A protein has these predicted regions:
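Short secondary-structure junctions
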Residues: 83-90
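Conserved N-terminal beta-strand and adjoining loop/helix that marks the start
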Residues: 14-44, 65, 96
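Short, low-complexity, intrinsically disordered N-terminal peptides in bacterial proteins
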Residues: 1-29, 156-164
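Conserved Nudix-box catalytic region and its N-terminal flanking loop in Nudix hydrolases
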Residues: 43-82
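NUDIX/MutT-family hydrolases
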Residues: 112, 121-155
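Active-site-adjacent beta-strand/loop module that shapes the phosphate/pyrophosphate-binding cleft
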Residues: 39, 87, 96-120, 127
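Short loop segments at secondary-structure junctions
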Residues: 39-42, 50, 114-119, 132-135
Length: 164
């Protein structure tokens, strides 16, 4: 699994968030490994962003930035151990999306994770919730919304992906 190529041979979509806000012209693209943890009942894990981070309190799939020389799978394994205390047994590269936030330009490399060991421990004082469509936690991070749309398509779900 490469750390810079899309997970699937599809074009990478760029989504712009808060387009009216200024952006620095010299922002580097930040590679992020994102774990989409799915239980046997098809519920998926969302965690809240910790205080002190951009979009604190928003709900997202757990993950984090790649370090120099890491693959997506290596970064995901490290980040999920550091942030939520689990060890992933395997992951499947799934989708890739670029999000242009005012504070950062990120490439989100989503991986499905169905097998892990350990109990969830929110090591950054974040909250967690196992969700189904439509998700009931709010607010949802803009970078998370495409995943909910992909789930809806895969699961033939019709309706809002985030409850009103």
């Amino acid at each position: 699994m490469s750390s810079t190529e899309p997970a699937i041979n599809e074009p990478i979509t760029v989504r712009v968030v808060d387009a009216q806000l200024p952006r620095s012209a010299d922002r580097a693209l930040v590679q992020v490994a994102v774990g989409v943890l799915i239980r046997s009942d098809d519920s998926f894990l969302l965690t809240s962003r910790p205080e002190g981070k951009a979009y604190a309190g928003y709900w997202e799939f757990p993950g984090g930035k790649l370090e120099v020389g890491e693959t997506i799978a290596q970064a995901l394994k490290r980040e999920l151990q550091e942030e939520i205390g689990i060890t992933i047994e395997d992951c499947m590269s799934w989708k890739t999306e670029q999000i242009d936030y005012p504070h950062a330009l990120v490439q989100l490399n989503f991986c499905k994770v169905r097998r892990w060991s350990g109990e969830l421990q929110m090591r950054e004082a974040q909250l967690y919730a196992w969700q189904q469509l439509p998700v009931t936690v709010k607010p949802v991070l803009p970078g998370t919304l495409p995943v909910l749309e992909w789930f809806a398509k895969e699961r033939s779900f019709v309706g809002l992906t985030v409850a009103e």
